[in-house]
Structures are given as C-alpha cells and as structure tokens.
Amino acid sequence: MKAAVYRSYGPPEVLKIEDVEKASLKDTDEDRVLIKVRSSSVNPFDYYHRMGFLPVRISNGFITPKQQIMGIDVAGTIEAVSKNVTKFKVGDRVFGSCLGSHAEYVRARQSAIAVIPNNITFNEAAVVPCVALSAVQAIKDVAQVKKGQKVLIIGGSGGIGHFAVQIAKYYGAEVTAVCSTSNLGWVKDIGADHVIDYIKQDFTKNGKKYDVILDASAARTFFSCKRSLTENGFYMTENPTKPGFQLFQVLLGSLTRDKKMKGVGLTKTGGENL
C-alpha cells in the first residue's frame, strides 16, 4: 500500500509517499478492525510529530521516529474485523483516531472509532475526530463545565475552538469566544453568547472574569490570562507540547501545584464521544 512516511524528523521535505507493507490484522488482535482509508486530515499533532519536538521524541524516539506513517484522523470502510469485535462489521462506514492514517489501510481499536452518520461524507467525517475529541476532553472531562459558568475560548473559530464553543454551550455555560473579525458572525451563530475580536480588543484588559479559559490556539500564556480568571477558575491550553513557553508554563504549574493551570492534549480516542 502507499503511505505518507517520514523516516527522520524535520521539515516537509522529510515526508515521502512510499510503497510499504499493507496494514493487516494480526493473529493476536482481539478488538481491532482494518480500515480502508477513504479520507484523512492534517492536524497540529502531525506537524509536531514530523518536526520531532522534544515531548514527541520522548515517546516516539529521540533520533528516529518509531511511528513512521503520518496521520491520526481517519474515515473509511471496514475491510476486516478481529474475533472480539462486536460493534462493527465489514463494510461499515467509520471514522475515528488512530496512528498511521495517512495510508491506504490502517488498523484501529473498535473503541476508537464510530459509525459515520448517513448524511456525512468521508471528507467531512475525517476532519472531526482529533479536534472534536480534544474539545470534549477539555470542556467535559477536564473543566467539567457546569450550567451558569463563564467560559472563554481563545481561537473560537478554529478546529478545536468551534467544537468547544458548542460543547460548552451544550453544558449550559455562558460562552465568550475570541476570534478574528471575519469569523465573529458565524461563531455567534454556532452558540457563542459573546464574541471578542482579538484584532480590536484585548480580553485581559476588559476587567471581566471567567471560570474557565481554554486557549485552543496556544496564543496566550497562562500568566497573561491569570488576572482574567475567577478565584477558583483555571486556564487550559490545547497545545501543551508547543515549542516555547507553553510547555514550560504547564510544567511550572505542576511543580508549584498551581491548580489554575492545565495542559490538555488528545489523551483518549474514545469512539463513544464521537
């Protein structure tokens, strides 16, 4: 099969389209499915892995990447199932998150995928998993947003951000989204109670306080947002592995036991949340 492969870390030039051994189910697989990939997407996750930033190298190899096929989001049809798979059958249209999805075939756990709704195309489904699951984990699992809380989402028109706006609104929060001028209207249409044009206004200087600040674009530091938090509020960044101050501030928060600071990444690829 053909796949997008990187055998060393670096710029886009390290990516090559190569013929590699076709992915297949193993005799030891119990809960895996084989997916014929119809569509995939590109996320910051892929960029950080290809470039080989330090947090990535800790898990994926310091010199040479262990996982050499790119991709995490997938949409396609099930080609085969292992013995204990009960939720899916051959031919099902599915989407989800699994490593190595920039290829013609990929193995995935049944717990990491879901059936694509009939009114959704493969291309539309492929852009959902990573960003939507990250937003769910931030708003539902980490922040545990409740009705009446004030939530600020930086990057409210981005991939993670626009899902976070809708999810926070679903849980009854009063949602403020920060985005650019051209996106103010549609971000309000999808559920934001208030919108702030970051080009014209700095939310840290308007005197308002929020129970939760989610930086979905890693555009601001915790330290710059701290004065905009309520006494028991906290800040989350969706890109804790971003080079520079973001990783430093998350580590500092852990070392100082500062409960106001949390780094959130895609840690669970649960299909039930899709």
Where are these regions (language model features)?
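NAD(P)H dinucleotide-binding glycine-rich loop of Rossmann-like/cofactor-binding domains
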Residues: 48, 63-73, 80, 93-155
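Glycine-rich beta-strand-centered segment in the early N-terminal region that forms part
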Residues: 23-41, 54-100
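A short acidic, Gly/Pro-enriched loop at the edge of an enzyme's catalytic core
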Residues: 204-212
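N-terminal Rossmann-like NAD(P) cofactor-binding module of classical short-chain dehydrogenase/reductase
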Residues: 95, 196, 213-214
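Mid-domain Rossmann-like dinucleotide-binding core that forms the NAD(H)/NADP(H) cofactor-binding site
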Residues: 125-197
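Glycine-rich phosphate-binding loop and adjacent beta-alpha segment
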Residues: 219-274
